[in-house]
Amino acid sequence: MSSVVVVGTQWGDEGKGKITDFLSENAEVIARYQGGNNAGHTIKFDGITYKLHLIPSGIFYKDKTCVIGNGMVVDPKALVTELAYLHERNVSTDNLRISNRAHVILPYHLKLDEVEEERKGANKIGTTKKGIGPAYMDKAARIGIRIADLLDRDAFAEKLERNLEEKNRLLEKMYETEGFKLEDILDEYYEYGQQIKKYVCDTSVVLNDALDEGRRVLFEGAQGVMLDIDQGTYPFVTSSNPVAAVSQSVLVSARPKIKHVVGVSKAYTTRVGDGPFPTELKDEIGDQIREVGREYGTTTGRPPRVGWFDSVVVRHARRVSGITDLSLNSIDVLAGIETLKICVRYRYKGEIIEEFPASLKALAECEPVYEEMPGWTEDITGAKSLSELPENARHYLERVSQLTGIPLSIFSVGPDRSQTNVLRSVYRAN
């Protein structure tokens, strides 16, 4: 059986949750491999909209195993809240598995994220203030607290006390703000651990057994390649690696098991937070796309910046993440725009460049070189195949595929699960 990775090709919010939910129907295990509750997934089916941040999108299928992998950072309070959110809607979570090696986000991570962002002032990154960066910093510094520690009260208390000495000194001396007391955190978070205890296990065993048995595993990335700490618009990035290659290194052994990588894009571009954005629209067309596309971040609620489709960005994502299949979302949002534009390359200091620059300064000075295409006015939200799309819409999809170098496998004409159309199976043998 083929196993598949789903990654975002832009700056997140491309609709990965919807596509993962759709592909979950034919998978047997769905695993998230990085990030935390800074990511937001919106899934809509049967007229109901669900919003998740930590739990994999496949949770709505009772017969699928859903995994929160060891590469994630988990806010136990947020996780317990999300579990309650699902239970209130009669969604079973008995199929959830949580890695005992995933790192824990604690109140001091949230506080440090907030005060550091405030300290940066005009140089702020635009963090979601969910404690993600500080938690990954502790992981790299080898002082992090893991889920396994959270379940052992004595081990948790010992590590928490040691960490609070350092964190309080930092908060009080550098940021001139109040620190935390051990008792403010210990009992509450230990109780959260007890509430999730039944889901906790060694998820590498779950995943390797599934792969060895030939079961279909779907690896679900969060954010997007352009927010990858190595390959994205550093430092305006997240603190982990959304790129597909990391899915194996943080979840399973190094044996090659992934057959296909699905790159999810919008038919335009959005970005939440700061940093250079070459194709950004600051006019009425941008406002129209934002409103028609209901563009507000699932996690932050912030209205994103909006721009034309940037093939330079998606080509970069294809190269660094090994993308084999393109899933293009929100095509319906572009209806009614007379002339559409696609960025095909950049102009930098009078020179044409085809590749995405590593230098943030250079990127900020890049001008997009556009190719114009005629738009369409028809309502395409009911289209079930390429042949049902207007000619101009078909040409737009074909051109995006050509410019990115990625064959189009899925296209979406609305937010509902039923508005997703498959041109070729991503679970194919080769």
Curated annotation (Swiss-Prot):
It is an enzyme of class 6 (ligase). The active site is at 13 (proton acceptor), 41 (proton donor). The keyword Metal-binding applies. Mg(2+) binds at residues 13, 40. Pathway: Purine metabolism; AMP biosynthesis via de novo pathway; AMP from IMP: step 1/2. Its EC number is 6.3.4.4. It is found in: Cytoplasm. IMP binds at residues 13-16, 38-41, 128, 142, 223, 238, 302. One of its GO terms (cellular component) is cytoplasm. InterPro entries: Adenylosuccin_syn_GTP-bd, Adenylosuccin_syn_Lys_AS, Adenylosuccinate_synth_dom1, Adenylosuccinate_synth_dom2, Adenylosuccinate_synth_dom3, Adenylosuccinate_synthetase, P-loop_NTPase. Its cofactor is Mg(2+). GO terms for molecular function: adenylosuccinate synthase activity; GTP binding; magnesium ion binding. GTP binds at residues 12-18, 40-42, 330-332, 412-414. Homodimer. NCBIfam families: PRK01117.1 (NF002223), purA (TIGR00184). This is Adenylosuccinate synthetase. It comes from Bacillus subtilis (strain 168). The gene is purA.
